[in-house]
């Protein structure tokens, strides 16, 4: 799950409500074709949770459970023990679903960017979604930095032949070709005449001269130099493995 939230506020909302458990959810209108590996909540008018069930793709408007909840430690431990006694396959969501009638379980809506990355298509879709500047602003905030491992590199070099549109490009790259609607990782080399469209290119990849790739995810250290056209259908993006040479 990829999202941004102030957990202090979430915890305060839970305490003020007096609920036993508070679940975080995101309202979506495309649940028929997306979030098919997620659980969805059944809510009453007071935002009380009546059920936690798998998304079967039979309704477009759903409340997707974000696998985030707040409860007292003692309650959490007792639920885990009860679930273990019932079945080793029982999850926390399963036992919470069983307790909807006996516990006060409530839902809190999340606002802003949200992506559930549970398979390859959702990974690709989440990367493409963040090319939208408004969506990126909902996730990344100037006054709320993201702590991550740093890697100092020189700025990306754009040559005279470079043509870049609507893309996110990390530092340390050398861009001589065309890049459109793509995410380019650190230290990539895109040679003269190369075209990269609608693709996610991870770090240290080399795209050779006159190579055309479209709708692809290219893993680290791959070299695309011999095969001149690698294009997958937009609805089924392709994957090029780490360290591959094509």
Please annotate each region the language model reported.
Residues 1-127, 240-242:
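Unchanged
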Residues 74, 83-246:
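Left-handed beta-helix
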């Amino acid at each position: 799950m990829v999202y941004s939230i102030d957990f202090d506020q979430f915890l305060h909302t839970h305490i003020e409500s007096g609920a036993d458990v508070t679940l975080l959810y995101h309202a979506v209108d495309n649940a028929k074709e997306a979030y098919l590996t997620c659980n969805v909540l059944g809510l009453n008018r007071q935002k009380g949770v009546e059920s936690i069930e798998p998304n079967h793709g039979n309704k477009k408007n759903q409340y997707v459970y974000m696998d985030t909840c707040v409860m007292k430690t003692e309650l959490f431990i007792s639920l885990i023990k009860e679930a273990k006694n019932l079945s080793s396959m029982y999850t926390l969501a399963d036992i919470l679903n069983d307790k909807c009638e006996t516990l006060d379980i409530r839902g809190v809506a999340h606002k802003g960017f949200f992506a559930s990355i549970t398979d390859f298509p959702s990974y690709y879709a989440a990367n493409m979604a963040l090319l939208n500047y408004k969506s990126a602003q909902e996730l990344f905030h100037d006054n709320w930095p993201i702590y991550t491992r740093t890697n100092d590199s020189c700025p990306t070099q754009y040559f005279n032949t470079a043509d870049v549109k609507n893309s996110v490009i990390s530092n340390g790259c050398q861009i001589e070709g065309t890049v459109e609607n793509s995410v380019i990782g650190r230290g990539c080399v895109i040679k003269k005449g190369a075209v990269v469209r609608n693709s996610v290119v991870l770090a240290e990849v080399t795209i050779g001269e006159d190579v055309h790739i479209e709708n692809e995810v290219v893993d680290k250290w791959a070299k695309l130099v011999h095969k001149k056209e690698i294009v997958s259908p937009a609805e089924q993006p392709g994957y090029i493995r780490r360290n591959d040479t094509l």
